[in-house]
């Protein structure tokens, strides 16, 4: 348990060192804004970080997550979108994620992000329906819808929606899962430096993950996904 706590602390500490404000500091083009929306919006997506199987009517899942998204930091538009003009090659998003099981194979959840020393705040909601619950011999199959909203950034507004199809199968302490997502990212700007049209970008992502339960109640989850960008996630929490 001490090692697990140490990992969480190190992940969050790495984020604090990397924190930067998002703001438009110089002129960007409409094409730049579209590319920024794709990459930054991908980092804000409410990724599943969980298998397809339902929690059950009494189930809870409370966890800390770190989701890291690669970005094209060598592009000029990124230099004009962070306060110091020196972007990192990734965006780390630490999340508090809570899920609750409901009747009829439905799970609902929420996540919240408040990045210290930055202007970035983020919240999201999700709902998942298990078409197949899964069993000792059959996989679980579910559909999931999610929404996330950026707050705290004066120069831009961003919200995202996604629709996921997930499949998973448990084996002892391990539950591998995979899925595909249809995503939509909406962005607009409020800067005095530019006048740009609103952007709405639709895309697709594939994902794969593995949930590991070394002890009762404790879960460790790793997930990778690929679409406009590569994304890597780690989750540590309690499921009961």
What are these regions (language model features)?
Residues 60-64, 108, 125, 139-145, ...:
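Transmembrane beta-strands of outer-membrane beta-barrel proteins
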Residues 20-135:
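Transmembrane beta-barrel domains of Gram-negative outer membranes and organellar outer membranes
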């Amino acid at each position: 348990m001490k090692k697990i706590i140490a990992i969480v602390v190190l992940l969050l500490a790495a984020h604090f060192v990397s924190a930067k404000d998002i703001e438009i500091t110089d002129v960007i083009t409409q094409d730049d804004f579209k590319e920024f929306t794709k990459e930054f919006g991908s980092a804000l997506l409410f990724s599943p970080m969980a298998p397809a199987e339902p929690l059950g009517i009494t189930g809870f899942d409370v966890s800390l997550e770190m989701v890291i998204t690669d970005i094209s930091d060598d592009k000029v538009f990124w230099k004009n979108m962070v306060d110091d003009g020196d972007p990192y090659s990734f965006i780390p998003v630490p999340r508090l994620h809570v899920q609750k099981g409901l009747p009829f194979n439905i799970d609902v959840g929420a996540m919240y992000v408040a990045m210290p020393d930055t202007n970035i705040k983020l919240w999201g909601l999700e709902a998942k329906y298990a078409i197949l619950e899964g069993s000792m011999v059959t996989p679980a199959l579910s559909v999931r819808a999610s929404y996330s909203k950026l707050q705290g950034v004066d120069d831009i507004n961003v919200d995202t929606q996604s629709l996921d199809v997930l499949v998973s199968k448990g084996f002892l302490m391990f539950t591998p899962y995979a899925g595909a997502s249809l995503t939509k990212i909406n962005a607009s700007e409020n800067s005095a430096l530019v006048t740009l049209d609103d952007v709405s970008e639709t895309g697709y992502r594939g994902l794969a993950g593995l949930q590991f339960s070394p002890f009762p109640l404790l879960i460790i989850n790793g997930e990778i996904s690929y679409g406009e960008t590569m994304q890597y996630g780690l989750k540590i929490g309690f499921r009961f």
